[in-house]
């Protein structure tokens, strides 16, 4: 199966590059998959800096070995659709897989280029290629005020049109049950699947709690900072945490959001020098495991959210307790994936401090939360996630073959009922690859409805 993965990809510093890396790495493990990554051109990233505040330079970021990467589109460019389509036509893949948020191709300050890029999946399908989108948020869940967007009504009109364009793809997967409900209800479509974000380890290793609290009890905040992911409340809360837990240390890692260059550096400059706060900046992928293994608690200090949390899933991978803002998306994520998360009132530094102190004071609570999160991570490894995508793609290849060549009907039916790639296993992108149990369910009140099949030929 030939797959083109359209995504930001390391060493790019742009949003979702890490997720695309883990998807690509897992796809490479499947010998029947021929993967080509259609990635963004490398640039100097003023918003992504190291611990010294130095910007990441394109010339200093070598390509990752072992991947077939074609850098054929540029962030913020109007030529993105043409360049992508020309490359796709030349490669003739079986599947074109887009890994997207609404700002994947341009910032809100450049809406025409953003819309041009986001129209590419519809154009890809129109050219006859099976096209799938993994959409990490839906615009209806975005707090535009927190994200710093002006002209909100006009922007919502534009993003409504953009969403309809995205839904012209053969299939779209979202990562929260509420997001699927929004798209199916508001836009009257049936090609939306519920998938899982996944944890990034193919073979998870149980947490080693002896690496934590020796000697520091580390609080980790990691992400792309400056819009709805903000550090002010955490900085206000930390002195109270330190007073109660003298061994506490705060680590702030990650880059600025690409629209907020210099944000975390300004936060760093405002902190008293005596506080045990370490600002690490952008963390290379190879340093992520040790960062999480030595973390006592992950904190999600957000003002709002736009989807499932990548850092929360990494915390599950390494068995780390989580303290997060009490946001509906996070509540849904924790309930749907059985995560252990202690919530604090959004913007309330005192409540945040109390929740962190409660976790850090109790080794038993840290172990209990860590083990529950690790168990949740075992249910949704990236290997299971990718296998379910591949089953879905194979199923749609069978459907296409049935229509184009009726002679294939009997062999397809034999495969269908053999169980190896059949409907029973391919029906939901959120299935657990280790069992027949289905976790991918749409929540409506207290009831759960299974995801319907999408007909890619409709």
For each predicted feature, which ranges?
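Membrane-proximal helix-turn-helix segments that form the acceptor-binding/catalytic region
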Residues: 116-126, 152-171
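Glycosyltransferase donor-sugar binding loop
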Residues: 41-45, 249-265, 281
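Conserved acidic donor-binding segment of nucleotide-sugar-dependent glycosyltransferases
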Residues: 341-349, 357-363
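Acidic donor-binding loop of glycosyltransferase active sites
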Residues: 292-307, 320
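A short, well-ordered alpha-helix in the C-terminal region of glycosyltransferases
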Residues: 365-379, 391
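Nucleotide-activated donor-binding/catalytic signature segment of Leloir-type glycosyltransferases, i.e.
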Residues: 264-289
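Conserved donor-binding/catalytic core segment of Leloir-type glycosyltransferases
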Residues: 4-5, 211-229, 235-238, 251
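Donor nucleotide-sugar binding/catalytic pocket of nucleotide-sugar-dependent glycosyltransferases
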Residues: 155, 162-205
């Amino acid at each position: 199966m030939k797959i083109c993965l359209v995504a930001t990809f390391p060493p790019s510093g742009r949003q979702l590059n890490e997720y695309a890396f883990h998807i690509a790495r897992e796809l490479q493990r499947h010998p029947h998959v021929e993967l080509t990554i259609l990635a963004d051109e490398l640039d100097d990233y003023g918003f992504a800096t190291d611990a010294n505040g130095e910007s990441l330079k394109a010339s200093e970021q070598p390509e990752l070995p072992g991947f077939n990467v074609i850098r054929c589109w540029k962030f913020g460019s109007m030529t993105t659709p043409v360049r992508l389509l020309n490359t796709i036509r030349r490669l003739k893949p079986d599947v074109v897989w887009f890994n997207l948020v609404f700002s994947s191709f341009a910032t809100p300050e450049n809406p025409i280029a953003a819309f041009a890029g986001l129209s590419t999946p519809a154009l890809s399908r129109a050219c006859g290629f099976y096209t799938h989108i993994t959409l990490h948020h839906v615009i209806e869940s975005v707090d535009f005020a927190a994200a710093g967007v002006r002209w909100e009504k006009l922007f919502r009109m534009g993003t409504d049109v953009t969403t309809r364009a995205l839904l012209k793809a053969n299939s779209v997967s979202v990562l929260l049950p509420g997001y699927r409900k929004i798209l199916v209800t508001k836009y009257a479509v049936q090609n939306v699947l519920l998938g899982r974000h996944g944890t990034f380890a193919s073979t998870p290793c149980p947490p080693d709690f002896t690496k934590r609290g020796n000697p520091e009890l580390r609080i980790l905040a990691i992400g792309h900072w400056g819009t709805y992911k903000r550090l002010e409340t955490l900085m206000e809360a930390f002195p109270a945490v330190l007073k109660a837990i003298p061994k506490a240390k705060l680590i702030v890692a990650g880059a600025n959001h690409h629209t907020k260059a210099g944000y975390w550096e300004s936060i760093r400059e405002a902190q008293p020098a005596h506080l045990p706060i370490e600002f690490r900046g952008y963390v290379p992928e190879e340093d992520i495991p040790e960062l999480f293994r030595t973390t006592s608690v992950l904190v999600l200090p957000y003002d709002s959210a736009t989807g499932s949390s990548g850092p929360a899933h990494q915390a599950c991978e390494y068995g780390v307790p989580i303290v997060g803002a009490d946001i509906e998306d996070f509540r849904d994520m924790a309930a749907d994936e059985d995560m252990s998360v202690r919530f604090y009132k959004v913007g309330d530094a005192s409540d945040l401090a109390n929740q962190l102190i409660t976790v850090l004071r109790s080794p038993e609570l840290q172990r209990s939360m860590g083990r529950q999160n690790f168990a949740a991570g075992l249910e949704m490894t990236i290997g299971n996630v990718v296998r379910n995508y591949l089953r879905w793609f194979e199923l749609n290849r069978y459907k296409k073959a049935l229509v184009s060549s009726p002679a294939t009907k009997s062999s397809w039916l034999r495969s269908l009922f053999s169980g190896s790639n059949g409907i029973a296993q391919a029906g939901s992108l959120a299935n657990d690859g280790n069992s027949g149990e289905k976790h991918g369910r749409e929540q409506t009140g207290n009831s759960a409805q299974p995801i319907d099949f999408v007909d890619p030929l409709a």
